[in-house]
């Protein structure tokens, strides 16, 4: 790989920010919104990872909750205002994005709504034309009084449902607990029969969240735009929405990094990072550009600050050395022998960085 061919792509929520904006919007606008969102998110995980519903992709939670956000008064302006006032960056994120933009074409590919992503771009000075995210115009959808009333009744029913359980070894719908199967069947009726027939159903038909295969499509478009190749891409992700781009890039010879990832991310990535700071993103991007995928993987097998000397930008190493000992990033190459441990450790670490409620989400 030539230095000038490297391309940097990252998810937003996780590697760059601590937010789960959709979860937070649900909590802000919808009564008992935290539980409501968590339940719909579990349903999303089951649809995407176990049932593999045709046309369904990880992150479609973001369209499923839209009718309810609208019924409870969410507008473009309210979503933009709330999002801009509640951005929580991972320490170092602004500096990392400035650094990577200097050394290679850099992009954000996020499932998040445009209201949040555009607010974040304004805050950190990232070019909006280098962002792929979920486009939605809330003000376009007018709901009748009857639909608003009915959606509020449905919200109450969903919030009162038992939380779906997903056993670790569940690979089929039949392997799910009976109670979870009943919840999933009822949610199928609600979303794909009742709501789809409402005016609010237009949101489910028209909004296309950038998760799963849509993130992979964004990666393909970025490679085309930059005239590069998948083997020149380094991608940072943290959740189920990154599984498809991870697979695409890995199979194309690029490098995939789980940053404080959950089980879905660690399962598909080649390097696992656990860090309170984005400095490690800057370092991995820098060394990937200089010594390529195999060289970076080799360093990750026996990671140490001393092994980075002579390769990594000295200013990055100085910043790394100023971190407190207990804040030093952990970097490991994922292999069959350590993957179970890394899934456990990364999932737990994720909760300490992003909070228990957000950390548990798929």
For each feature predicted by the language model, list its residue ranges.
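C-terminal cap/substrate-recognition subdomain and adjoining C-terminal extension
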Residues: 1-3, 91, 112-362
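Alpha-helical substrate-recognition element adjacent to the catalytic core
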Residues: 1-150, 209, 272, 276, ...
């Amino acid at each position: 790989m030539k230095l000038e061919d490297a391309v940097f792509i990252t998810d937003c929520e996780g590697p760059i920010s601590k937010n789960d904006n959709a979860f937070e919007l649900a909590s802000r606008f919808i009564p008992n919104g935290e539980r409501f969102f968590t339940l719909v998110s579990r349903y999303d995980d089951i649809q995407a990872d176990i049932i593999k519903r045709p046309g369904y992709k990880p992150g479609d939670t973001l369209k499923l909750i839209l009718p309810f956000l609208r019924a409870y008064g969410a507008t473009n302006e309210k979503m933009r205002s709330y999002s801009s006032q509640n951005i929580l960056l991972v320490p170092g994120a602004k500096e990392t994005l400035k650094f990577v933009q200097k050394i290679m074409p850099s992009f954000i590919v996020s499932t998040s709504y445009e209201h949040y992503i555009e607010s974040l771009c304004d805050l950190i000075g990232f070019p909006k034309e280098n962002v792929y995210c979920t486009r939605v115009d809330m003000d376009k959808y007018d709901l009748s009084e009857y639909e608003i009333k009915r959606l509020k009744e449905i919200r109450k029913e969903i919030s009162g449902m038992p939380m779906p359980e997903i056993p670790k070894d569940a690979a089929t719908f039949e392997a799910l607990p009976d109670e979870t199967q009943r919840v999933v069947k009822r949610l199928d009726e609600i979303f794909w029969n009742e709501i789809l027939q409402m005016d609010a159903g237009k949101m489910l038909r028209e909004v296309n969240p950038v998760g799963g295969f849509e993130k992979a499509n964004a990666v393909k478009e970025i490679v085309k735009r930059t005239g590069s190749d998948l083997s020149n891409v380094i991608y940072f992700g943290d959740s189920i929405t990154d599984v498809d781009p991870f697979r695409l890039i890995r199979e194309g010879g690029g490098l995939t990094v789980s940053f404080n990832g959950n089980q879905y991310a660690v399962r598909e990535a080649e390097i696992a990072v656990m860090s309170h700071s984005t400095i490690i993103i800057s370092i991995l991007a820098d060394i990937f550009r200089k010594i390529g995928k195999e060289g970076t993987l080799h360093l990750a097998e026996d990671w140490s600050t001393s092994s980075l000397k002579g390769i990594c930008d000295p200013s990055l190493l100085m910043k790394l050395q100023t971190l407190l000992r207990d804040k030093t990033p952990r970097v490991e190459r994922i292999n069959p022998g350590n993957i179970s441990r890394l899934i456990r450790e990364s999932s737990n670490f994720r909760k300490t960085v992003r909070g228990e409620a957000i950390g548990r989400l798929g």
